UniProtKB/Swiss-Prot annotation:
One Pfam family hit: Fe_bilin_red
InterPro entries named in the record: Ferredoxin-dep_bilin_Rdtase, Ferredoxin_bilin_OxRdtase
Organism: Nostoc punctiforme (strain ATCC 29133 / PCC 73102)
Enzyme class of the recorded protein, top EC level: oxidoreductase
UniProt record, GO biological process: phytochromobilin biosynthetic process
Record's function text: Catalyzes the four-electron reduction of biliverdin IX-alpha (2-electron reduction at both the A and D rings); the reaction proceeds via an isolatable 2-electron intermediate, 181,182-dihydrobiliverdin.
Alphabetically ordered keywords of this record: Oxidoreductase
Source species, domain of life: Bacteria
Catalytic activity from the UniProt record: (2R,3Z)-phycocyanobilin + 4 oxidized [2Fe-2S]-[ferredoxin] = biliverdin IXalpha + 4 reduced [2Fe-2S]-[ferredoxin] + 4 H(+)
GO MF annotation list: cobalt ion binding; phycocyanobilin:ferredoxin oxidoreductase activity
Protein family (similarity comment): Belongs to the HY2 family.
Name of the featured protein: Phycocyanobilin:ferredoxin oxidoreductase
Length: 245
């Protein structure tokens, strides 16, 4: 389906964030049958202040037959910080991993870029069809790889977490995210509903993923400083990483 084009925060952000936001939405529109996913009105576009700087958050959400929620968040804190955050939450009736991607930048540079297709199975492995497709992608060598956080055992062996050191490395990261998205969307379209037992396991896997992601202290601290701990907790658990039911 088509959606009315709206001015986006991405036009004011780092070029890689703008390019990645466009890339994600282009892949979604190309492959999937999108319909709107409605957030509470007060959480779609949010403004606040942090350390004297204006904080702006823009959320766009969709859903499809295979994904209960596809969330693209853009955030900006004056000239200090630019953020892109994206997660595709599968419906538990489908045996699909979690696509996640984040960019963090400030003062004209990207300091962190991460993308992954994270397994939700108890044995922490991706479906074989994913492993086969991802293993065929060329190995990328970045000059400044970064270490995953302590709770990062939710990520797969194909996870990329880097500080892009040049425009060429930014382009490499962008290209790999598009490859992840193409693989993920095509696998989702070809997938079939699973057994009731597998649905229960998928729910448990998504709960684990969301619970671990809610431990991201950096995100929580920024939100608490700008909006207070109650608002931050609500946003973390209803917008960013809501648990499936």
């Amino acid at each position: 389906m088509s959606f009315t084009s709206m001015p986006s925060l991405r036009e004011q952000q780092h070029p890689l964030i703008r390019q990645l936001a466009d890339c994600i939405e282009a892949a979604w529109h190309q492959h999937l049958d999108l319909s709107p996913y409605h957030l509470p009105d007060e959480l779609g576009y949010v403004e606040g202040r942090l350390e004297g700087e204006k904080l702006t958050i823009e959320n766009r959400c969709y859903q499809t037959p295979q994904f209960r929620k596809m969330h693209l968040e853009l955030a900006n804190i004056g000239n200090m910080l630019d953020i892109l955050h994206c997660v595709m939450f599968p419906r538990p009736q489908y045996n699909l991993p979690m696509f996640g991607c984040d960019l963090v930048g400030g003062r004209g540079q990207i300091s962190a870029a991460i993308a992954d297709l994270s397994p939700i199975q108890l044995e922490r492995t991706l479906p074989e069809s994913y492993t086969t497709a991802l293993a065929q992608l060329p190995v990328l060598n970045f000059s400044q790889p970064r270490e995953l956080p302590e709770w990062g055992n939710i990520f797969s062996d194909f996870c990329i977490f880097v500080r892009p050191g040049s425009p060429e490395e930014e382009a490499m990261f962008l290209s790999r995210v598009r490859e992840f998205l193409d693989i993920h969307c095509m696998q989702a379209i070809a997938s079939h509903p699973v057994s009731v037992e597998q649905v229960t396991q998928n729910l448990a896997g998504q709960h684990n993923y969301c619970t671990k992601q809610q431990q991201n202290d950096k995100t929580r601290r920024v939100l608490e400083k700008a909006f207070g701990p109650v608002w931050a907790e609500n946003y973390m658990t209803t917008v960013l990483f809501d648990l499936p039911t």
